[in-house]
Amino acid sequence: KTIKFIQGRTDEPIKVRAHPGDLNRDRTKTKHDWSWINAYHNVELIDSINVTLHQSMKTARCAVFYNSSSSVLSVLKGIPTFVAEESAVTWDVANHNLKTIMHPVVPDRTQWFNDLAQAHWTLEQSRNGDIYRHFEQYLPT
């Protein structure tokens, strides 16, 4: 349903990244039958075993998630992010309505970065710059 909705607004290619636990190394069906993807034009299933999340997002114009910790990387990289579930860790800095997919908002992430850092790092790591050094690689230049 989501793919069809997006295709109604753009003809750009869509890449679907399966959870790594859903595919085995030779990309055959494990937990889910992914053959439905073949019914769509210009949609590709990404090999999430051999292609990293970083590689998957390298050319992304936006990223769409239901609720996934993977959405954190797209926000860190400054990729317009869409999440559907309010409990997503990226909810506050994500778009929620796919009708805006061609003109997504990239909100100010400063407070979100602060909140994320405070939730995962010690005060000492903050003082000595570990947090900044860790996230610096993901920030747009």
Question: Where does each model-flagged region fall?
Answer:
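Active-site regions of enzymes building and remodeling cell-envelope glycoconjugates
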Residues: 40-45, 79-80, 94-102
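Catalytic donor nucleotide-activated moiety binding site of glycosyltransferases and closely related
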Residues: 3-48
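A donor-sugar binding/catalytic signature common to diverse glycosyltransferases
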Residues: 49-95
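Leloir-type glycosyltransferase catalytic cores
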Residues: 93-141
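Glycine-rich loops and low-complexity Gly/Arg-rich segments
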Residues: 39-42, 70-72, 88-91, 105-109
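Short, solvent-exposed coil/turn linker segments
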Residues: 1, 32-33, 52, 97, ...
